[in-house]
Protein backbone atom coordinates (compact mmCIF):
# COMPACT_ATOMS: atom_id res chain seq x y z
CA UNK A 1 0.00 0.00 0.00
CA UNK A 2 2.87 2.29 0.68
CA UNK A 3 4.10 1.70 -2.83
CA UNK A 4 0.70 2.63 -4.25
CA UNK A 5 0.66 5.88 -2.26
CA UNK A 6 4.13 6.78 -3.51
CA UNK A 7 3.13 6.07 -7.09
CA UNK A 8 0.03 8.25 -6.75
CA UNK A 9 2.15 11.09 -5.32
CA UNK A 10 4.62 10.72 -8.17
CA UNK A 11 1.77 10.76 -10.68
CA UNK A 12 0.26 13.87 -9.07
CA UNK A 13 3.64 15.62 -9.14
CA UNK A 14 4.17 14.59 -12.75
CA UNK A 15 0.65 15.71 -13.69
CA UNK A 16 1.15 19.02 -11.87
CA UNK A 17 4.50 19.51 -13.60
CA UNK A 18 2.99 18.57 -16.93
CA UNK A 19 0.01 20.84 -16.23
CA UNK A 20 2.31 23.78 -15.44
CA UNK A 21 4.32 23.13 -18.61
CA UNK A 22 1.11 22.94 -20.64
CA UNK A 23 -0.23 26.13 -19.04
CA UNK A 24 3.06 27.89 -19.73
CA UNK A 25 3.01 26.68 -23.31
CA UNK A 26 -0.62 27.82 -23.71
CA UNK A 27 0.30 31.29 -22.38
CA UNK A 28 3.26 31.49 -24.77
CA UNK A 29 1.08 30.49 -27.69
CA UNK A 30 -1.61 33.01 -26.70
CA UNK A 31 1.04 35.76 -26.56
CA UNK A 32 2.35 34.70 -29.96
CA UNK A 33 -1.19 34.68 -31.33
CA UNK A 34 -1.85 38.18 -29.95
CA UNK A 35 1.44 39.41 -31.46
CA UNK A 36 0.57 37.81 -34.81
CA UNK A 37 -2.90 39.42 -34.75
CA UNK A 38 -1.31 42.79 -33.93
CA UNK A 39 1.16 42.40 -36.80
CA UNK A 40 -1.65 41.43 -39.15
CA UNK A 41 -3.71 44.47 -38.12
CA UNK A 42 -0.69 46.73 -38.58
CA UNK A 43 0.00 45.22 -42.00
CA UNK A 44 -3.62 45.81 -43.05
CA UNK A 45 -3.47 49.39 -41.74
CA UNK A 46 -0.17 50.00 -43.56
CA UNK A 47 -1.66 48.61 -46.76
CA UNK A 48 -4.70 50.89 -46.42
CA UNK A 49 -2.40 53.88 -45.83
CA UNK A 50 -0.32 53.03 -48.90
CA UNK A 51 -3.48 52.71 -51.01
CA UNK A 52 -4.85 56.00 -49.68
CA UNK A 53 -1.55 57.79 -50.36
CA UNK A 54 -1.39 56.32 -53.85
CA UNK A 55 -4.96 57.44 -54.56
CA UNK A 56 -4.14 60.93 -53.28
CA UNK A 57 -1.01 61.06 -55.43
CA UNK A 58 -2.97 60.02 -58.51
CA UNK A 59 -5.68 62.57 -57.69
CA UNK A 60 -3.07 65.33 -57.32
CA UNK A 61 -1.41 64.26 -60.55
CA UNK A 62 -4.74 64.51 -62.37
CA UNK A 63 -5.64 67.75 -60.66
CA UNK A 64 -2.36 69.54 -61.32
CA UNK A 65 -1.22 67.88 -64.55
CA UNK A 66 -2.26 71.03 -66.40
CA UNK A 67 -0.14 73.31 -64.21
CA UNK A 68 2.82 73.73 -66.60
CA UNK A 69 0.58 73.90 -69.65
CA UNK A 70 -1.67 76.50 -67.99
CA UNK A 71 1.33 78.58 -66.94
CA UNK A 72 2.51 78.66 -70.54
CA UNK A 73 -0.92 79.87 -71.73
CA UNK A 74 -1.19 82.80 -69.30
CA UNK A 75 0.93 85.18 -71.43
CA UNK A 76 -1.44 84.52 -74.35
CA UNK A 77 -4.41 85.57 -72.22
CA UNK A 78 -2.47 88.63 -71.04
CA UNK A 79 -1.73 89.58 -74.66
CA UNK A 80 -5.37 89.25 -75.72
CA UNK A 81 -6.50 91.38 -72.76
CA UNK A 82 -3.81 93.95 -73.53
CA UNK A 83 -4.92 94.08 -77.18
CA UNK A 84 -8.48 94.82 -76.05
CA UNK A 85 -7.33 97.44 -73.56
CA UNK A 86 -5.34 99.30 -76.22
CA UNK A 87 -7.90 99.17 -79.01
CA UNK A 88 -10.80 101.53 -79.34
CA UNK A 89 -14.30 100.11 -79.66
CA UNK A 90 -15.25 103.22 -81.65
CA UNK A 91 -12.58 102.84 -84.34
CA UNK A 92 -14.25 101.32 -87.41
CA UNK A 93 -10.93 100.06 -88.81
CA UNK A 94 -10.29 97.73 -85.86
CA UNK A 95 -13.87 97.04 -84.82
CA UNK A 96 -14.06 93.60 -86.47
CA UNK A 97 -10.60 92.65 -85.26
CA UNK A 98 -11.55 93.75 -81.75
CA UNK A 99 -14.72 91.62 -81.89
CA UNK A 100 -12.65 88.63 -83.01
CA UNK A 101 -10.19 89.15 -80.15
CA UNK A 102 -13.09 89.47 -77.67
CA UNK A 103 -14.64 86.20 -78.89
CA UNK A 104 -11.28 84.44 -78.83
CA UNK A 105 -10.61 85.66 -75.29
CA UNK A 106 -14.08 84.59 -74.13
CA UNK A 107 -13.67 81.10 -75.60
CA UNK A 108 -10.25 80.88 -74.02
CA UNK A 109 -11.54 81.93 -70.60
CA UNK A 110 -14.50 79.53 -70.80
CA UNK A 111 -12.15 76.67 -71.61
CA UNK A 112 -9.89 77.56 -68.69
CA UNK A 113 -12.88 77.66 -66.33
CA UNK A 114 -13.80 74.12 -67.38
CA UNK A 115 -10.38 73.03 -66.15
CA UNK A 116 -10.70 74.97 -62.86
CA UNK A 117 -8.30 77.76 -63.79
CA UNK A 118 -9.64 80.96 -62.28
CA UNK A 119 -8.39 84.54 -62.48
CA UNK A 120 -7.38 86.53 -59.41
CA UNK A 121 -8.35 90.15 -60.12
CA UNK A 122 -8.21 91.82 -56.69
CA UNK A 123 -8.91 95.44 -57.65
CA UNK A 124 -10.28 97.22 -54.54
CA UNK A 125 -9.81 94.21 -52.25
CA UNK A 126 -7.48 94.02 -49.25
CA UNK A 127 -3.92 92.99 -50.09
CA UNK A 128 -3.39 89.25 -49.60
CA UNK A 129 0.29 88.22 -49.73
CA UNK A 130 -0.71 84.63 -50.47
CA UNK A 131 -2.31 85.62 -53.80
CA UNK A 132 -0.86 89.06 -54.58
CA UNK A 133 2.60 90.41 -55.26
CA UNK A 134 3.02 94.08 -54.35
CA UNK A 135 4.89 95.89 -57.11
CA UNK A 136 4.53 99.35 -55.58
CA UNK A 137 2.98 101.25 -52.67
CA UNK A 138 1.03 104.43 -53.30
CA UNK A 139 -0.36 106.94 -50.81
CA UNK A 140 -4.11 107.27 -51.04
CA UNK A 141 -6.48 108.82 -48.51
CA UNK A 142 -9.63 107.65 -50.33
CA UNK A 143 -9.22 103.92 -49.65
CA UNK A 144 -8.19 101.81 -46.68
CA UNK A 145 -4.45 101.24 -46.29
CA UNK A 146 -3.27 97.90 -47.73
CA UNK A 147 -6.00 97.85 -50.38
CA UNK A 148 -5.26 96.99 -53.99
CA UNK A 149 -5.38 100.19 -56.07
CA UNK A 150 -4.28 98.88 -59.44
CA UNK A 151 -3.66 95.47 -61.00
CA UNK A 152 -0.69 95.28 -63.38
CA UNK A 153 -1.25 91.62 -64.15
CA UNK A 154 -3.98 89.23 -63.05
CA UNK A 155 -3.07 86.22 -60.99
CA UNK A 156 -4.42 82.72 -61.53
CA UNK A 157 -5.40 79.75 -59.38
CA UNK A 158 -5.51 76.16 -60.66
CA UNK A 159 -7.82 74.02 -58.50
CA UNK A 160 -7.32 76.46 -55.65
CA UNK A 161 -3.49 76.37 -55.88
CA UNK A 162 -1.73 79.60 -56.81
CA UNK A 163 -0.37 79.38 -60.33
CA UNK A 164 0.71 83.01 -60.63
CA UNK A 165 0.26 85.85 -58.12
CA UNK A 166 -1.54 89.02 -59.15
CA UNK A 167 0.92 91.90 -59.54
CA UNK A 168 -0.61 94.90 -57.81
CA UNK A 169 -0.17 98.43 -56.50
CA UNK A 170 -1.10 98.64 -52.82
CA UNK A 171 -2.40 101.72 -51.01
CA UNK A 172 -0.78 103.15 -47.93
CA UNK A 173 -1.91 105.86 -45.56
CA UNK A 174 -0.76 109.35 -46.48
CA UNK A 175 2.25 110.38 -44.47
CA UNK A 176 1.81 113.28 -42.10
CA UNK A 177 3.23 116.47 -43.53
CA UNK A 178 6.70 117.20 -42.21
CA UNK A 179 6.78 120.55 -40.42
CA UNK A 180 8.84 123.12 -42.29
CA UNK A 181 11.84 124.81 -40.74
CA UNK A 182 9.78 127.96 -40.14
CA UNK A 183 7.13 125.97 -38.22
CA UNK A 184 9.75 124.38 -35.98
CA UNK A 185 11.13 127.74 -34.87
Curated annotation (Swiss-Prot):
This is Protein GrpE. It comes from Pseudomonas putida (strain ATCC 47054 / DSM 6125 / CFBP 8728 / NCIMB 11950 / KT2440). SUPFAM superfamilies: Coiled-coil domain of nucleotide exchange factor GrpE, Head domain of nucleotide exchange factor GrpE. Belongs to the GrpE family. Residues 1-22 are annotated as: Disordered. GO terms for biological process: protein folding. Homodimer. Its main location: cytoplasm. Coiled coil: none annotated. InterPro entries: GrpE (IPR000740), GrpE_coiled_coil (IPR013805), GrpE_head (IPR009012). CDD domains: GrpE (cd00446). It is found in: Cytoplasm. Keywords: Chaperone, Cytoplasm, Stress response. The keyword Oxidoreductase does not apply. Residues 1-12 have a biased composition (Basic and acidic residues). Gene3D superfamilies: 3.90.20.20, Head domain of nucleotide exchange factor GrpE (2.30.22.10). GO terms for molecular function: adenyl-nucleotide exchange factor activity; protein homodimerization activity; protein-folding chaperone binding; unfolded protein binding. Participates actively in the response to hyperosmotic and heat shock by preventing the aggregation of stress-denatured proteins, in association with DnaK and GrpE. It is the nucleotide exchange factor for DnaK and may function as a thermosensor. Unfolded proteins bind initially to DnaJ; upon interaction with the DnaJ-bound protein, DnaK hydrolyzes its bound ATP, resulting in the formation of a stable complex. GrpE releases ADP from DnaK; ATP binding to DnaK triggers the release of the substrate protein, thus completing the reaction cycle.
Amino acid sequence: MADEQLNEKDLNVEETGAGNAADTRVLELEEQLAAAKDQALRAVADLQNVRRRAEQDVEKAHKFALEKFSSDLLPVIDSLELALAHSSADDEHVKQIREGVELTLKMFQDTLKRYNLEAVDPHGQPFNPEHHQAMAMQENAEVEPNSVLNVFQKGYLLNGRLLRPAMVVVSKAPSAAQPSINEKA
